[in-house]
UniProtKB/Swiss-Prot annotation:
Its cofactor is Fe(2+); L-ascorbate. Its EC number is 1.14.11.-. This is PKHD-type hydroxylase Plav_0037. NCBIfam families: PRK05467.1-3 (NF003974). Residues 78-172 form the Fe2OG dioxygenase domain. Fe cation binds at H96, D98, H153. The keyword Oxidoreductase applies. InterPro entries: Oxoglu/Fe-dep_dioxygenase_dom (IPR005123), PKHD_hydroxylase (IPR023550), Pro_4_hyd_alph (IPR006620), Pro_4_hyd_alph_FE2OG_OXY (IPR044862). GO terms for molecular function: 2-oxoglutarate-dependent dioxygenase activity; iron ion binding; L-ascorbic acid binding. Binds 1 Fe(2+) ion per subunit. Signal peptide: none annotated. It comes from the Bacteria.
Amino acid sequence: MFIEIAGILGAADLRLADTVFAQKDAFESGARTAGRIARAVKNNEQAKPAGLAADLTMLVEKRLMKNDVFRAAARPRNFIRILLSRYTQGMAYGLHSDDAFMERQRVDLSFTLFLSPPESYEGGELIVEEPAGERLVKLEAGSLVLYPSATLHRVAEVTSGERRAAVGWIRSLVRSAEDRETLFDVALALRQAEAAGDRALTDRLLKIQGSLLRRWGED
């Protein structure tokens, strides 16, 4: 399942991001954390995991865990890693899929949380390969795209400006992408039943959701 979620970060959060990205000597080559194959096609910079950058990654995790849509779509067991990345003119990230394991944990989902307004840079689209063709993603600052980590994707070359983002990898409580999508559909139906005040249907859907989580979920 491929899903976009708007408004993960607010104005104050984005101001903190601006402060982090304005720091001198706070960034290093992004190739350091790439897998063996991806390292050859990765050309960006990422923040060193300390100080304000560490504060921002913790804030991103906190905001995501408070977002109902994100939790329903990802069913996160834990965040394996969150990095702050930037691309300036001439930088890009070639076609790749994310590692199956990071830090001895299975990687199920990846996300890109955009931190700079789309009009502030040219190029830099996240390009995802799908059976029907390529999907280009370039969202408003504070908005996120979530997708299975096995997806082939790349970042187009930035031709002007600076593309800023937080990228992260998640181990889900539910291994299968199809099962996560089914649970997401149940969560949407549950929200609709609650909004309609249909207590009987709400209880029935809660039972179904619980049964599916017991069947598909992992401790």
